[in-house]
Design a protein with these regions (language model features):
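Terminal leader/tail segments of proteins
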Residues: 2-166
Length: 166
C-alpha cells in the first residue's frame, strides 16, 4: 500500500462514524445537590464517551447551558469515583481513567439549585483523541497529517430533564 493509499484509508475511516457518543447526559440523573437541607447546586451523570473508556486529560472542554443560561466553568466540577476537579483542570490529570462502567458526575454550584419541573440542558464536550494512526513509517505522517490529533471530536446534546422535587 502506498503512502497516498494509507492516507486515503485513514481519512475514509476518520470521516465515517465517530467514537464519541452524542448521548452525553444520563437520562433521569438530574438532581439537586443538598447539603444540610440547603440546595447548593445540581448534578447529573455523564454517559461514558467511548465504549472503551476515556482518559480525563483528553477532555478539552465541557460547555453547559441550563434553560438557556450558560454555566461558568468556575462553577462546574467533574467527579469520577473519589476524584473531583474543576472542569478546567481535567487536562492536568493524566493519570485518571474513566473506565467504561464508572459513574461520572457533572456538579454545578448554584445557590438554590434548580426548581422542580423540566429543565433544558445543552452540553457540548470537546475530546482530544488519546491515540492515533500513522500512515507512514516510525513518526512519518504524524506531524502534518495526524487528523485525529489535530481535530478533536465534539459531542453535543440538547435534552429536557426533570427534577421531581426542588
Amino acid at each position: 500500500m502506498t503512502k497516498e493509499e494509507r492516507i486515503a484509508a485513514i481519512d475514509a475511516a476518520i470521516g465515517h462514524g465517530q467514537m464519541m457518543t452524542d448521548d452525553i447526559v444520563h437520562k433521569g440523573s438530574l438532581q439537586n445537590k443538598v447539603i444540610c437541607g440547603c440546595r447548593t447546586g445540581y448534578k447529573f451523570k455523564m454517559n461514558n464517551l467511548s465504549y472503551r473508556g476515556v482518559w480525563i486529560s483528553t477532555l478539552e472542554n465541557i460547555s453547559l447551558k441550563v434553560d438557556g443560561e450558560e454555566v461558568s466553568h468556575k462553577d462546574m466540577s467533574i467527579q469520577l469515583r473519589d476524584f473531583l476537579c474543576n472542569v478546567d483542570e481535567t487536562g492536568n490529570n493524566t493519570d485518571v481513567f474513566w473506565a467504561a462502567k464508572d459513574e461520572c458526575w457533572i456538579i454545578v454550584n448554584k445557590v438554590g439549585g434548580l426548581s422542580a419541573g423540566d429543565h433544558t440542558l445543552e452540553i457540548e464536550v470537546t475530546k482530544r483523541n488519546d491515540f492515533g494512526h500513522s500512515f507512514g513509517e516510525a513518526e512519518e505522517g504524524y506531524a502534518e497529517n495526524a487528523h485525529e490529533f489535530q481535530h478533536p471530536t465534539v459531542g453535543k446534546q440538547k435534552i429536557v430533564c426533570r427534577i421531581e422535587e426542588a
